[in-house]
């Protein structure tokens, strides 16, 4: 399906370590603003997800050749609800994003070992429903290690969250401040775009 956009494109390239040094939604996910409607056909649309038991970040980018453009991003806030309701809302929100934006690929951060067993379990549940929602709608789902994501965006695998967020804004020409979870989700999407472009899709395919 061809989509179009009026926003400018930005070439996305891996950053060196030296160079790198330099709105919540609790219900249905809103449709993108009219300004995100396209005038230039793109090759691939990627939905990046940063699932969590309290809030889930999402970021959508369009890729054309060696360039990426921001389409939409934000957070699904489920704080204050029982776990069952949280998971249902995450599932519904991810499903709505896939239906609304029709991504060609969905990218998600690979789970890491957590010191707190209870937190690890809740994170796993949130990731599970997000993956299930995307896969059940036929999306191609890929996982990336946290270090690989940081390396792709900043050129430094141990970069901190502020550094990653700043590079995401720079690469996508964003003047707005991003919520931490939304920035992380966009970073995952950019990592997938770079991996796809390099022809080295070594992420773990889960769908």
Language model feature labels by segment:
Residues 1-207:
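Phosphate- and other anionic-substrate recognition elements at nucleic-acid/protein interfaces
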């Amino acid at each position: 399906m061809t989509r179009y956009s009026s926003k400018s494109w930005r070439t996305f390239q891996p950053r060196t370590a030296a160079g790198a040094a330099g709105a919540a939604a609790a219900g249905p996910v809103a449709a993108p603003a009219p300004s995100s409607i396209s005038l230039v056909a793109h090759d691939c649309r990627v939905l990046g997800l940063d699932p969590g038991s309290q809030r889930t970040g999402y970021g959508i980018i369009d890729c054309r050749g060696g360039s990426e453009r921001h389409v939409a991003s934000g957070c699904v806030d489920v704080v204050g609800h029982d776990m069952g309701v949280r998971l249902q809302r995450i599932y519904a929100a991810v499903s709505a994003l896939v239906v609304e934006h029709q991504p060609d690929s969905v990218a998600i951060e690979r789970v890491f070992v957590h010191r707190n067993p209870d937190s690890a379990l809740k994170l796993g549940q949130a990731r599970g429903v997000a993956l299930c929602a995307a896969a059940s709608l036929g999306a191609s789902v890929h996982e990336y290690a946290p270090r690989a994501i940081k390396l792709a965006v900043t050129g430094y695998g141990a970069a901190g969250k502020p550094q990653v967020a700043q590079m995401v804004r720079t690469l996508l020409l964003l003047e707005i401040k991003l919520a931490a979870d939304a920035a992380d989700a966009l970073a995952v999407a950019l990592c997938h775009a770079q991996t796809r472009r390099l022809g080295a899709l070594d992420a773990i395919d889960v769908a």
